[in-house]
């Protein structure tokens, strides 16, 4: 185990290291956002593309939940899924929250839903779909590779929107505010479940996490291409 994962004993620690080397926050597109270098049109295009991933994401969580062999694990994942779907008093599903952000970027719901997916967006959605259904370990690794990055991403996105783009509308920021907090708990759940995997399944989780992290960065490269940003 330790040799296969560069000396890491815990699966989650090995995945953390792999994801850090494939960080979304280190991608030039997100760095440009943080610096205020993206145009309004680029942010609008991003809002339209990323919506399709946000809308598809609960189905990946559902597949991981369905494949989980542990009743306790299923309960924990069900709480994650309920959060994504907006189940509970006073909660909104996360696709609806994203539409609030898109509206703040100048794209109404009809425009967002009608937007054609670029190849990199299609690849991200299909990669997540495939990994979440391949096996429980694979889906869990992919889920962790995504959700473990979201609190830091959300924090920097809020900072960039407020300080660089003058965004003050609560509806525009709410998606990121929710994820800055909720995905700390979600990633903790995934970490606990990853480190409880049988030894024979840990390599699958690690490989899936690496594949999903690459697909996330490829999505951002697609946004560079679509918006004419130098790659």
Which residue ranges define each predicted feature?
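Non-heme di-metal
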Residues: 2-231
